[in-house]
A protein has these predicted regions:
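Conserved ATP/PPi-binding loop(s) of AMP-dependent carboxylate-activating enzymes
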Residues: 291-295, 306-338, 376
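Conserved pre-ATP/AMP-binding loop-to-beta segment of ANL
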Residues: 11-12, 106-123, 130, 135, ...
């Protein structure tokens, strides 16, 4: 398989259409990438301040072709957070948008020592300027791209809507897989609540739509299932667990319309993807994550590290595969480190496996509290509240014997508290329910739990 970053320089197929309706062929994109790659020294460290635009895409691909190492960052990153990263990692170059488009700025810094296999740096999921980065190798990128193409059956006829952030592994995986197959990317920075988003989808006949759980909640409120989108063939969901009720609703609707609905599972530490639920199983298995992607393997381990083989037992989900990344970096010197994981990733997620070999995520290993001696899953509490009070959003955090629940409908605080105490059979003093205007989320739609934890008593 030719690496996706090595574009077909003789192809006049359309590679990219942006939200100004400007199209670039593979030939044109390859020329722009080659021109920039010639100016980049091999093994240079490059900060790519990106959005979903052809300019940002050129920077990303040029780095990979030149064997420079890009760190993908949101172009709207707060200046103080960017400065923190600049101080820690001291990159040689920044690729960023200026008054006349994207341009390369030489920072006159010597290149750090970097492992030969290091291809890409990306911030950990939910990170907001944290210096903790995931180190991804060329082999990681190739292996995960190949697996995703395999189970999604991506071909050159696809026209993928690329609206998830390019600095987020889910968004980046859409770009990688479709470029690898010579398909078309529809790049946009708008979202579902903006009218231009749906005009763009319809005008350019998008064949696939992807989103995180929060995206699908918004789509439900927008009555997405009533929209006329005749070109749409594939729906994908990753970035967290979808509510089983919404999973069931979307899967049933997709099956009725002849669409494919994929529930998927992944992490930055696994390049992007680890698991998926085949569309033909989606309607009958609400809340189920699925099976390992082609070339990967799952196992469950108990607290001692012993493998759990019995169906229905809970344990930590462990993934094995070529897409397991090299490890983390928290400082410049870490870029010289080699493979610290050796193809094994303890995900930190608790899961169970049924008799058919399908896995269900039940919560984060760190998202369980002891409340008056009882083990309480915070993810399960959130699910209970949202189902019983559908008009509110909910996030649960806290510490042992003190569960802090934040809801967006403050008028229901006492009702939620009483409901949780009764349903969980715990004294009401275990719960503190607070109204909040909006749940803080990052650009990828993931909840920023640390911001809420900082508000706790």
């Amino acid at each position: 398989m030719t690496p996706f970053w090595q574009l077909a320089a003789d192809s006049d197929a359309v590679a990219v259409i942006d939200e100004q309706n400007i199209a670039l062929t593979y030939r044109e994109l390859a020329q722009s990438v080659a021109a920039l790659a010639e100016t980049l020294p091999a093994r240079a460290l490059v900060f790519c301040l990106c959005d979903n635009s052809p300019g940002a895409l050129v920077g990303y691909l040029a780095c990979l072709n030149a064997r420079a190492v890009p760190l993908m960052l949101d172009k709207t990153i707060a200046p103080e957070l960017l400065q923190q990263l600049l101080d820690i990692y001291r990159p040689g170059f920044i690729w960023q948008q200026g008054a006349e488009g994207y341009a390369l700025e030489d920072l006159q810094q010597p290149a750090p020592e970097m492992d030969d296999s290091l291809a890409l740096l990306i911030a950990t999921s939910g990170s907001t300027g944290s210096p903790k980065l995931v180190r991804q190798s060329y082999q990681n990128l190739l292996a995960n791209t190949r697996s995703i193409i395999d189970y999604l059956d991506i071909d050159r006829h696809e026209r993928a809507l690329a609206w998830l952030p390019m600095n987020y592994v889910y968004g980046l995986s859409i770009i990688n897989t479709h470029l690898a197959q010579g398909a078309t990317l529809l790049l946009t920075n708008s979202g579902p609540v903006q009218p231009g988003f749906w005009r763009f989808v319809k005008q350019h006949a998008a064949t696939s739509l992807s989103g995180v759980p929060y995206s699908w909640e918004i789509l439900k409120k927008l009555r997405f299932t009533r929209m006329d989108l005749p070109s749409l063939k594939t729906l994908t969901q990753a970035g967290g667990k979808l509510r089983p009720e919404l999973h069931s609703e979307m899967a049933a609707w997709a099956a009725d319309k002849g669409l494919r609905f994929f529930v998927m599972y992944g992490a930055s530490e696994a390049t992007s993807r680890m698991g998926y639920l085949p569309p033909e199983l989606a309607a009958d298995h609400p809340g189920v994550m699925g099976r390992a992607i082609p070339g990967g393997r799952f196992a469950l381990e108990d607290e001692t590290g012993a493998e759990i083989t019995a169906a229905g037992e809970r344990g930590e989900l462990v993934y094995y595969g070529e897409n397991v990344t090299l490890g983390y970096a928290t400082c410049r010197a870490d870029l010289a480190k080699g493979d610290e994981r050796h193809g094994r990733l303890a995900t930190g997620d608790m899961a169970s496996r049924n008799e058919a070999g399908l896995y269900t995520i039940v919560g984060r290993k760190t998202r369980f509290l002891k409340v008056f001696g009882n083990r309480v899953g915070l993810d399960e509490l959130e699910h209970l509240v949202v189902n019983a009070f559908p008009s509110t959003e909910c996030v649960a955090v806290g510490r042992d014997d003190n569960v802090q629940v934040f809801i967006t409908d403050a008028h229901q605080a006492e009702a939620v508290k009483s409901y949780l105490a009764k349903t969980c059979q715990l004294h009401h003093s275990a719960f503190r329910v607070t109204g909040i205007e909006a749940i803080p989320k990052n650009p990828a739609g993931k909840t920023l739990y640390r911001q809420l934890e900082a508000l706790c008593d």
